[in-house]
């Protein structure tokens, strides 16, 4: 938590005002967002700026998330993300050559923490074959009031519905033919205590409601993909050649 607080303290909000929203997807047109795969960048909640573009709330209470390469660029997050216990867990789950590709601090701020619509992580971290896996760490208690995760048990067996990728220089959602809508009537909430790790198959649909409570619901997330799978060049999340993906098991790039 101290590392998160330090990052926020050092962040100068005057330098960027990119909003992250899964409902409006306004961030998709932002170069700041598009090029964040190998950087540490800050994204705001909606409705935290006035008509002049000034923050209406303290920056620590206005951020939606920090991403997407904390695990490789910040020593505290790096030490946690490449911990041998996570490598052993990945081995127990038979993850093939897991490579850390994304990390995020998700704040889910009190009162203004936005809804995250139903989605599958493989939509954004597409590989052939599918290999994305999510590690979701509850940094605070997550409950129905402050926007806990909801999932659709077993739905990961029904394939990928959508892909978020670059088309003619723009980021777009592409629907797969014959994709069926999610049966959200079967949704199950995941209320968990601080310190809980939730593992998410990349094809498992999940969602969280807006946080209308007085309590934040902060989480740290990691995502891996297989180093043996194809990671297409038109995926939205890309890295420069000077920062290849590192093995969760060894921390090495080979």
Which residues are covered by each model-predicted region?
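Non-heme Fe(II)-dependent double-stranded beta-helix
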Residues: 1-115, 235, 243-248
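A structural signal for short, well-ordered beta-strand segments
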Residues: 103-105, 135-137, 220-224
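Catalytic core of non-heme Fe(II) oxygenases with the double-stranded beta-helix
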Residues: 73, 87-91, 99, 112-189, ...
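Exposed beta-sheet edge/beta-hairpin loop segments within beta-rich domains
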Residues: 80, 188-191
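Non-heme Fe(II)/2-oxoglutarate
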Residues: 13-17, 156-169, 194-199, 203-254
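Conserved short histidine dyad/triad with adjacent acidic residue
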Residues: 107-121, 202-207
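A generic structural signal for short beta-strands and their flanking turns/coil linkers
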Residues: 38, 45, 131-133, 216-218
